[in-house]
From Swiss-Prot:
Keywords: ATP synthesis, Cell inner membrane, Cell membrane, CF(1), Hydrogen ion transport, Ion transport, Membrane, Transport
Subunit structure comment from the entry: F-type ATPases have 2 components, CF(1) - the catalytic core - and CF(0) - the membrane proton channel. CF(1) has five subunits: alpha(3), beta(3), gamma(1), delta(1), epsilon(1). CF(0) has three main subunits: a, b and c.
Encoding gene, per UniProt annotation: atpG
Protein name, entry field: ATP synthase gamma chain
A GO biological process held by the record: proton motive force-driven plasma membrane ATP synthesis
Any one of the GO CC terms: proton-transporting ATP synthase complex
Family: Belongs to the ATPase gamma chain family.
Compartmental location: Cell inner membrane
Length: 286
């Protein structure tokens, strides 16, 4: 059995770590709430522009933008949204597993893969795993700006317009609730009709100045807004996952301290018993 002094040292060390994890949990709670507010603020725009684009796709306007035309898939692009920091449980690993599974399906069909990686963890993963990373950005901070993302997104959009990729996906975590974050792979382009929103309103649209000018700008904004929303939502997922991870670490530290305290008490009791026995034995010898 370890000595009392050694056990006291371990208890002190774990208590110090527990204070750190407890503080990190509280910080994550605060950051998660702010991220949720940003996520909620961006959702109406992202959802509304998706509805408008969906209606345009279903309505089959005279001008068919390349983003709305299906073609044979020879090369696939993924915009991967990961975190810059760790200590958030299996958030990134679960996301990468979903991505690798989806990539494997296309590779089996003979398609090549191009990657645009957002976040340091994604860049680190693909350095080890391998992959053709054509664009990367990291350290966007707690309040990412859409302007910071435009350059990397444009690389993938230009590749699609030039025929270098035939399908583009965004891969990120969806915020279900504080306890649940779901990795998702969503197709950005070509646009697919949303059956849930199909012709809810049988409206006819008049395009000014014309459908081509409208769609050329609107579709690019659509992709940018979806990627931005994915980044904001992934940040909320990161903070929620970190909060849970730090809470579990704090609770585990408490249990470990209790176990060590019990061991310490037993060791101390054994030492006292031994001292008493030695005193009694010495007195008897006298």
């Amino acid at each position: 059995m370890a000595g009392a002094k050694e056990i006291r040292s371990k208890i002190a060390s774990i208590k110090s770590t527990q204070k750190i994890t407890n503080a990190m949990e509280k910080v994550a709670v605060s950051k998660m709430r702010k991220a949720q507010m940003r996520m909620a603020a961006g959702r109406p725009y992202a959802e509304r522009i998706r509805q408008v684009i969906g209606h345009l796709a279903n309505a089959n306007p005279e001008y068919r933008h390349p983003f709305m035309v299906e073609r044979e898939v020879k090369r696939v692009g993924y915009i991967v949204v990961s975190s810059d920091r760790g200590l958030c449980g299996g958030l990134n690993i679960n996301l990468f597993k979903s991505l690798v599974k989806d990539m494997s399906g296309y590779r089996e069909q003979g398609a090549e893969i191009d990657l645009c990686v957002i976040g340091s963890k994604g860049a680190s993963f693909f350095r080890s795993f391998g992959g053709n990373v054509v664009a990367a950005i990291s350290h966007l901070g707690e309040e990412p700006s859409i302007n910071d993302l435009i350059g990397s997104v444009k690389v993938m959009l230009d590749a699609y317009l030039e025929g270098r990729i035939d399908r583009l996906f965004v891969v990120s975590n969806k915020f279900v609730n504080t306890m649940t974050q779901k990795p998702t792979v969503e197709q950005l382009i070509p646009l697919v009709a949303d059956d849930d929103q199909e012709l809810k309103h049988h409206w006819d649209y008049l395009y000014e100045p014309d459908a081509k000018s409208l769609l050329d700008g609107l579709l690019v904004r659509y992709v940018e807004s979806q990627v931005y929303q994915a980044v904001v939502e992934n940040n909320a997922c990161e903070q929620a996952a970190r909060m849970i991870a730090m809470k579990n670490a704090t609770d585990n530290a408490g249990e470990l301290i209790s176990d060590l305290q019990l061991i310490y008490n037993k060791a101390r009791q054994a030492a006292i018993t031994q001292e008493i026995s030695e005193i009694v034995g010495g007195a008897a010898a006298v």
